[in-house]
Amino acid sequence: MNCSIGNWKHTVLYLTLIVSLLYFIESLISHKLHINYNKIRLKRSPNLPLRFRDDGTFKILQVADMHFGMGMITRCRDVLDSEFEYCSDLNTTRFLRRMIESERPDLIAFTGDNIFGSSTTDAAESLLEAIGPAIEYGIPWAAVLGNHDHESTLNRLELMTFLSLMDFSVSQINPLVEDETKGDTMRLIDGFGNYRVRVYGAPGSVLANSTVFDLFFFDSGDREIVQGKRTYGWIKESQLRWLQDTSIQGHSQRIHVNPPALAFFHIPILEVRELWYTPFIGQFQEGVACSIVQSGVLQTFVSMGNVKAAFMGHDHVNDFCGTLKGVWFCYGGGFGYHAYGRPNWHRRARVIEAKLGKGRDTWEGIKLIKTWKRLDDEYLSKIDEQVLWETSDSFLK
């Protein structure tokens, strides 16, 4: 009898301990198990369609190679000894805010290596912090991937999915194709982050509801093996087919030519190396790191006729523009402080501005595209302003 009572007491004691332990564990993690309805919200979308301003201008800020890590604890690279102690990712954030306040862009184009994957333990958190100033100011933005973004906790598909769902983003995972039986489906295409952004004419103008400016974004890949050799990625044939198909779709019948277009991607094409032997504007300070494959990008741009310039990153201490067969290829210049650079060479950003032509009583299509850079110095110095394209033609039938 005494033995039975002892066993019963032990059982009650064990059960009490187990219940207490479970209650303790639940108290520690309950905030993670319950939905906080106050934090559930929809993506804040930009005002679409994007369009030119009342003054007939549209301005794009290109941000190349932020290489963002984990904020304050991620130190700068290649800065002066006197700057190093207090230099971190926050310097990159501060520079982005300065550029936004100075230029007031209509769109920000993040052209890859937005985060430096190996320097963060949480890719999503790093992206939120890196892109944060664009969201704070409510500015529409678009992003493509570089060759370092995916080296952390998210793969390339997951990264583009996340980027497309962030506030004020116009980024897309890949282009959609209309299917009468299935609805919109994603086109089978190489990479993640191939998409088109249309810009409409100025409010109240005859082209207010028409595409007058096309912006094409591409995934230029990561690393690949070609004939046993390791090389960088490149824009593939499927992407170029999509570009050609898309560029002829959906333009207003009021415009007698395809609107001018720009392209944005991370890794330069092979032909950019040839610019060393030509006049260029800016600085050509390092070799062009690109694929050994001649991708057909230049030939496609030339055959289309309306792609006026392409903007890229990847080689941080190159910031030049040069022209190949009538198409400009421009580096953004290294933006981020955790990216490699040169101690006496200021981080920088590129600005692109398009201006509409003025008819007798209305804004017409684009008349001029120009670009310049700003340095992250005391004065946010403006350098290397140049015209990329200009026309005297009328755009209307």
Swiss-Prot record:
Question: Per UniProt, where does Fe cation bind?
Answer: 316
| Assigned GO CC terms | extracellular region
Cofactor(s) essential for the protein: Fe cation; Zn(2+)
As given in the record, the signal peptide range reads: 1-30
Tissues/organs with expression: Expressed in roots, stems, leaves, flowers and siliques.
**Does the keyword section mention Glycoprotein?**
yes
Report the Gene3D superfamilies cross-referenced here: 3.60.21.10
Q: Which residues bind substrate?
A: 314-316
Keywords noted in UniProt = Glycoprotein, Iron, Metal-binding, Secreted, Signal, Zinc
**Quick one: which residues bind Zn(2+)?**
266, 314
* Gene Ontology MF terms: acid phosphatase activity; metal ion binding
Bound how, and how many: what does the cofactor note say?
A: Binds 1 Fe cation per subunit.
Asked if the record carries the keyword Nucleotide-binding, the reply is no
Q: Where in the cell is it found?
A: Secreted
Glycosylated residues, chain numbering: 91, 209
Q: What is its main location?
A: secreted
- Subunit text: Homodimer.
Q: Which family does it belong to?
A: Belongs to the metallophosphoesterase superfamily. Purple acid phosphatase family.
Q: What is this protein called?
A: Probable inactive purple acid phosphatase 28
